[in-house]
Amino acid sequence: MSKKLYLLQVQPEGKILELDPDNGELRTLVDGLKTHPDGIALDRSAGRLYVSYMGAEISPDSLEFFQADGRLESMTTEGNERRLLAGNGVFVTGKQLVHDAENHWLYWCDREGMRVFRARDDGSELTVLVQAGLFPAQSRDYTRHCVGVAIDSQHGHIYWTQKGPSKGGKGRILRAGLTLPQGAEADNRPDIEVVMASLPEPIDLEFDAEAGVMYWTDRGDDASGGNSLNSARLVDGRFTDHQILARGLEEGIALVSDTESGRMWLTDLGGNVWEYSLTSGGPLRRI
């Protein structure tokens, strides 16, 4: 049976889509979404999707989200039985979302809220794991904006990006424990480490735990290595061998891999879906 990709469309109308990457067949699951869906995760065994929302722009076409109206919801893979898991002022701007199916946790970033969250996949036990700044006073400091997230359950780590200003060359990938250290708060964790720094503008993350490889998209300046797919290898707790695997993204965002077929798919703000071969490498192929 062909595998499906679940995609989010923001403009001109918010939609949740299902794409067959082998034949290009596209199906709309949900339409009419008004609050900018951004992150999506699949629980294949339960047949459910999880979606984060950025909320409403402060003014039309501003692409600024400085009000606490982000949301997190779940639904079936057919777009039915929609349930609100978090919202009502709890966070500001929902970004990348990942699901730990084995332990029933959701992890996501709150960009303008400058935080990293987790909650059970029924919405319970909501916790702020990282707080990089104070909302709203520091929300326009883009070096504090948390965007992409990935987890390494084997070693008990969470990773996230703080992308920095557009094309600014100040992006970072950071790491901390999956749980708060005893006696610590989200805004003063002693276990936070910067594992990659001075990146053009890192966005979303994908961690291959079996291979020990971190992948990420970057939409920084082309001349500095932006608009690219990147990787680095985890060796003895440190990331080495940073490589730019492919270029040509039009402001890259999401990525997801299928190690069984040796493929990765990526999306960008240009409305493209790209395929990359993890086995042979080579250029991106537009689907």
Q: Residues of each region from the PLM?
A:
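Short loop/turn segments immediately following beta-strands, especially the blade-tip
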Residues: 119-123, 176-185, 231-237, 276-282
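An edge-strand/N-cap motif at the start of beta-rich repeat modules
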Residues: 1-28
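Blade-level signature of beta-propeller repeat domains, shared across WD40, Kelch, NHL, RCC1
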Residues: 267-287
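Short, conserved, GDST-rich strand-edge loop motifs in beta-rich repeat architectures
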Residues: 5-8, 52-69, 161-172, 217-225
